[in-house]
C-alpha cells in the first residue's frame, strides 16, 4: 500500500 498522504503524516518529508 503506497498512499502519498498516509505516510506523509507519519514522516513529514515536506518539512
UniProtKB/Swiss-Prot annotation:
Tell me the disulfide pairings in this chain.
Answer: none
Instruction: List cofactor names only.
Output: FAD
This entry's Gene Ontology molecular function terms read: carbon-monoxide oxygenase activity
Cofactor: how and how many bound? Binds 1 FAD per subunit.
Quote the catalytic activity from the record: CO + a quinone + H2O = a quinol + CO2
Q: Which residues form a coiled coil?
A: none
User: Could you tell me the keywords of this UniProt record?
Assistant: FAD, Flavoprotein, Oxidoreductase
Entry EC number(s):
1.2.5.3
Q: How does it assemble?
A: Heterotrimer consisting of a large, a medium and a small subunit.
Query: Main role?
Result: Catalyzes the oxidation of carbon monoxide to carbon dioxide.
Question: What name does this protein carry?
Answer: Carbon monoxide dehydrogenase medium chain
